[in-house]
């Protein structure tokens, strides 16, 4: 990866200042731990904020501005946002005009960056752009089929599930902490996409579905990874795991990229690893993110 330019550094620095001025952190929503210690995000106040949304203790307005959400889920900066905007324009520019995309971007009142700085006609949340680019890439590469099924490990606020619904008409079985799953389902319902949420594994043809995990699987302990391997990964005919194991493996006691690759192959999955995929943005390359993938 080329060195970051002064322009890019200033861009991200301005974003951090701008974002910090607009983040909200109401103490009454962030008390408690909400954690079982099994993952990086479960040790942060994010699950508490998700539970508040899922239970109806708060509305969705401003949800994506909560510090707890910004620290874990709403994390993409403007330099990466501009990168993803470029990918979207290259792959399917017309989708940017879809009102359903606008509804997803508006949900939770995220902090947006001006359109001209992203190379777009209007402001967007950079995180929204990453989810949209990911959904387009998954469809483009044949991992998520039109009208297909996705098992998503680590669902955030539901952004990728929503984008897969709009881009591919795909339904998603969410796998996360119960309160996070419930919060993401609420988001899907409020965006008119509730019918694309699968409540359980009933009726899922595992051989014809795609297992997707945007970082989350590599932020789990080995024990949890083993359980998910048996329950969700082994039978999935296709899979994409965006891995930041290089950052978190030692911290959480998870596996390195090579250990993950061996785990998948030992389970009979024809897995490969790609560190140059055109989905990976500047921050991914800086953090040595890789994509583990397979197609049976």
Language-model regions, residue ranges each:
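A short SAM/SAH-binding and catalytic strip from SAM-dependent methyltransferases
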Residues: 209-223
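Conserved class I S-adenosyl-L-methionine
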Residues: 146-156
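Conserved SAM-binding loop of SAM-dependent methyltransferases across substrates and taxa
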Residues: 157-169
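A short, conserved alpha-helix within the catalytic core of class I
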Residues: 220-232
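Class I SAM-dependent methyltransferase SAM/SAH-binding core
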Residues: 170-193
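Conserved Class I S-adenosyl-L-methionine-dependent methyltransferase catalytic core
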Residues: 32-145
